[in-house]
A protein has these predicted regions:
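A charged N-terminal "starter" segment
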Residues: 1-85
Length: 85
């Protein structure tokens, strides 16, 4: 979990409003979902609101849902396997 001091430091550096994601926490929650749902359930990341998380999610989820040529281009740029889109 991000410390308050780090959040304040980032807010001063980048201004607000801003989006801040704790990637370790995200990975932990995805892993917890996998454990709860079991091996028969495959996770798909819908990248609509957060396309900048594609690289971080590549190893965590099974598939990526794209709804536009731009989203597809992001997956290509991040070298997501075509079979996973």
């Amino acid at each position: 979990m991000l410390e308050i001091a780090k959040i304040v430091e980032l807010a001063k550096e980048h201004a607000t409003p801003m989006y801040l994601f704790d990637l370790d926490e995200l990975q932990s929650r995805v892993q917890a979902m996998k454990e709860i749902l079991g091996e028969d359930i495959r996770l798909c990341y819908a990248m609509k609101a957060n396309p900048f998380l594609v690289d971080s999610m590549k190893q965590a989820v099974h598939k990526f849902e794209v709804c536009s040529p731009g989203e597809f281009a992001i997956c290509e740029r991040e070298q997501v396997a075509m079979a996973d889109i």
